[in-house]
UniProtKB/Swiss-Prot annotation:
<keyword id="KW-0539">Nucleus</keyword>
<dbReference type="Pfam" id="PF02902">
    <property type="entry name" value="Peptidase_C48"/>
</dbReference>
<comment type="similarity">
    <text>Belongs to the peptidase C48 family.</text>
</comment>
<keyword id="KW-0645">Protease</keyword>
<keyword id="KW-0132">Cell division</keyword>
<feature type="region of interest" description="Disordered">
    <location>
        <begin position="269"/>
        <end position="329"/>
    </location>
</feature>
<dbReference type="Pfam" id="PF19722">
    <property type="entry name" value="SENP3_5_N"/>
</dbReference>
<keyword id="KW-0378">Hydrolase</keyword>
<keyword id="KW-0788">Thiol protease</keyword>
<keyword id="KW-0833">Ubl conjugation pathway</keyword>
<feature type="compositionally biased region" description="Basic and acidic residues">
    <location>
        <begin position="272"/>
        <end position="283"/>
    </location>
</feature>
<keyword id="KW-0131">Cell cycle</keyword>
<dbReference type="GO" id="GO:0016929">
    <property type="term" value="F:deSUMOylase activity"/>
</dbReference>
<dbReference type="GO" id="GO:0016926">
    <property type="term" value="P:protein desumoylation"/>
</dbReference>
<protein>
    <recommendedName>
        <fullName>Sentrin-specific protease 5</fullName>
        <ecNumber>3.4.22.-</ecNumber>
    </recommendedName>
</protein>
<comment type="subunit">
    <text>Interacts with CCAR2.</text>
</comment>
<dbReference type="InterPro" id="IPR045577">
    <property type="entry name" value="SENP3_5_cons_dom"/>
</dbReference>
């Protein structure tokens, strides 16, 4: 352990001396404290005889100061070399020699110091040069200790700066009085990582004629920084924090994804880029070679395509050249991927004619194949065949007697009965031909960049992605693909006035029968109008809805009541069935009466106040409620339970003596079931039915439809009762509640159950 500490101690000393870790930051304020202590004691003139390590620092103090003042090699512009006397070198290096220190000053650095001194001594012949250099040296030495020059590179300020403490280099060392120049002072760090902090301007130009340019501040960012554990640097935590972020898996994954996205080009960029490369290859391949010549890297050296003006047809060998049948298989153009060359026009008398491959069909015909040698090429004629290829698919477009005229403004392609703009698979092409001295030159950077993404070209199928491209190869028409389309519907012979009168009469009938438009559905309105006019009015729903809204505004209040047996419902009771309202006791009780009357011999429906009366007053409070009814002759008893804000249902199956609990929220109130069981036992003793005094069981039904809101519990209870009474399965859910509400409204108004 002691040996390990000693090794770390020495590493810390070496790191503090070398200052590698200080590159790129400001002056370090806190570094190895022993070194700081030694230098401070040395400046104060106090002897340091603490221990062996401190003596080592005392001996290396001067070496550290000299090491901080190392300079770069002489710049290339320095022409003069000086000879050095050995006595001076020995005198300079003698103060540095100590017992426990190393020689940090080499002969080359001593030579540089002597060169600066000899430069000053040789300049005394010229008063102008001497004064200028003396003033410059004075300016450098008089810099304050906290200036940018003294603080640069992390050097600590010195107490007594002298001219000898600043290693300097001078560009333009020996000049005659008549010559002019500029002096560059270079203050360099150790290991020849020099930095030029300024240029002391003399005249405008150097004596050799070249302009004087100050050196730029350069920092090797790829240089690794090895940190010692004994180092106390105030920015170390920030370095570690940023390093952890950069090395995190999320950051690296995100950066990789961003690089991949940047590297991938969009489909339009690929199209335009491939076409620009094609234009360059076509322009350079005019020498008759089947393969395009390599493109120069310098864009200024690119040759523009040249079109010869000849009375005869100009045939250029390429992918679109005319090859007789039988020679296609031996074509040198077969490969994995071929580039599309623009069809060269046949030029006659200063005009060019673009024509397509003539075929028997009048409409454009697309033939898709996988290999190029499977496409039959027509014989050579005056027209030019247009061949387009994308990887393994080759399409041949033929059009009969279609020409395009080439003028000074551009190339216009007109095709009747087809798209007005025609482009190749590799991308849209916009050309501008300029006629000058029997030649046509194509401007690549001008019109191509301006019109390459025009609206007309982007509308073309080949400017869209492959997923959005129409199915042209299969010959399918895109017109009226979905159901013939509603756009082709004929104008309705029924005007708005007739429709409004018929609709108003139908709404009057609904209001008279139900007291409101709550049970009315859209399907019923459209069905009624179709029966009257024998026409579908689905396309006129906005007008119908507007008429219904106006009708409701005119008939807001209606004196409507329903009487059934001992029950009476007014509009306030029926309004609970509208929207998300809670059902009240009147609606529950009257609907239970309808269920009981639908199957009078099997089902008995208790009033919603029965359970509350039983809990508050006991059996004597409800004894008279079943005075005229023998409960034990029924098959099913339906008992609604209303607990403040929630509706539940208890059923009693007398055949097997089972008491069941139904709740649309999955709640089980055991005390309610126990109260009903005690009531049945008491009722059996009162009616002298000993067979029902024992064998009762309770059950909780869970696999039933559940509500998904807080307002439809009463509707679920009524639907449970109806399905159990009519022995129907539970085939409803929360989505059916609006329809169930309308149906219950109608059943209450018509005083009968509907299937």
């Amino acid at each position: 352990m002691k040996k390990q500490r000693k090794i770390l101690w020495r590493k810390g000393i070496h790191l503090a001396f070398s200052e590698k870790w200080n590159t790129g930051f400001g002056g370090f304020k806190k570094f190895y404290f022993h070194q700081h202590l030694c230098i401070l004691k040395a400046k104060l003139g106090r002897p340091i005889t603490r221990n062996r390590q401190l003596r080592h620092f005392q001996g290396g103090k001067k070496a550290l100061q000299i090491q901080k003042t190392w300079v770069k090699d002489e710049p290339p512009c320095a022409k003069t070399k000086f000879s050095v006397d050995t006595p001076h070198a020995s005198t300079l290096s003698s103060p540095v020699k100590r017992k426990d220190t190393k020689h940090f000053v080499s002969s080359s650095r001593t030579l540089l110091r002597l060169q600066a001194e000899k430069l000053l001594s040789s300049a005394k012949n010229s008063d102008h040069e001497y004064c200028r250099e003396k003033n410059l040296l004075k300016t450098v030495t008089d810099f304050p200790s906290n200036s940018a020059l003294g603080q640069a590179n992390g050097h600590r300020p010195r107490t007594d700066p002298q001219a000898s403490d600043f290693p300097m280099k001078f560009n333009g060392e020996s000049q005659s009085p008549g010559e002019s120049g500029a002096i560059v002072i270079t203050l360099s760090n150790h290991k020849r990582k020099g930095f030029c902090y300024g240029c002391c301007r003399g005249p405008e130009h150097h004596r050799n004629g070249g302009p004087l340019i100050p050196k730029q501040f350069q920092l090797n960012r790829h240089r690794r920084i090895k940190l010692s554990p004994l180092m106390m640097y105030e920015k170390l935590s920030m370095i570690r924090f940023r390093y952890r972020i950069l090395r995190s898996q999320h950051f690296r994954t995100k950066s990789k994804v961003c690089k991949l996205r940047k590297a991938q080009r969009s489909w339009v960029q690929k199209v335009t880029g491939d076409h620009q490369e094609t234009l360059r290859e076509n322009g350079e391949g005019g020498s008759g070679s089947p393969f395009p010549s390599p493109e120069p890297k310098d864009p200024s050296c690119r040759q523009q395509p040249y079109f010869p003006d000849m009375d005869s047809n100009a045939v250029v060998k390429g992918t679109n050249s005319h090859v007789p049948d039988g020679h296609t298989k031996g074509s040198p153009f077969l490969g994995k991927e071929l580039s599309l060359d623009e069809a060269f026009p046949d030029q006659q008398n200063g005009s060019a004619t673009h024509a397509w491959d003539q075929s028997s069909c009048a409409s454009p015909k697309w033939e898709c194949t996988e290999l190029i040698h499977d496409i039959p090429l027509p014989e050579h004629h005056s027209n030019t065949m247009f061949v387009s290829e994308t990887e393994k698919e080759i399409a041949t477009l033929g059009q009969e007697n279609r020409t395009s005229s080439l003028s000074d403004d551009g190339v216009k392609l007109s095709v009747s009965g087809a798209d007005t703009s025609v482009s190749s698979v590799d991308g849209p092409v916009s050309q501008k031909a300029v006629h000058s001295e029997n030649s046509y030159q194509m401007e690549e950077d001008g019109s191509l960049k301006q019109n390459i993404l025009s609206s007309e070209l982007l509308d073309h199928p080949y400017c869209k992605s492959p997923l959005e491209a129409p199915l042209v190869c299969s010959g399918l028409k895109l017109e009226n693909q979905v159901g013939g389309g509603k756009d082709s519907q004929k104008a309705s012979p029924v005007d708005d006035e007739q429709l409004s009168v018929c609709l108003s009469g139908f709404l009057d009938e609904v209001m008279k029968k139900y007291g409101s438009l709550v049970p009315l559905s859209e399907k019923e309105v459209l069905g009624r109008l179709k029966d009257v006019f024998n026409e579908d009015f689905s396309n006129r729903k906005p007008f119908i809805n507007r008429e219904i809204t106006n009708y409701r505004a005119r008939h807001q209040k209606c004196n409507f009541r329903i009487f059934y047996n001992k029950h009476m419902l007014d509009m306030d009771d029926l309004a609970t069935l509208d929207g998300q309202n809670w059902l009240n006791d009147q609606v529950i009780n009257m609907y239970g009466e309808l269920i009981m009357d639908a199957v009078p011999d099997k089902v008995h429906f208790f009033n919603s106040f029965f359970h509350r009366q039983l809990v508050t007053k006991g059996y004597n409070g409800v004894k008279r409620w079943t005075k005229k009814v023998d409960l034990f002759k029924k098959s099913l008893l339906l008992i609604p339970i209303h607990l403040e804000v929630h509706w539940s249902l208890i059923t009693v199956t007398l055949s097997n003596r089972i008491i069941s609990f139904y709740d649309s929220q999955g709640i089980h109130f055991k005390f309610c079931v126990e109260n009903i069981r005690k009531y049945l036992l008491t009722e059996a003793r009162e009616k002298n039915r000993p067979e029902f005094l024992q064998g009762w069981q309770t059950a909780v039904t869970k696999c039933i439809p559940q509500q998904k809101n807080d307002s439809d519990c009463g509707v679920f209870v009524l639907q449970y009762c109806k399905c159990l009474a009519l022995e129907q399965p539970f085939q409803f859910s929360q989505e059916d509640m609006p329809r169930v509400r309308k149906r219950i409204y109608k059943e209450l108004c018509e005083c009968r159950l509907m299937d």
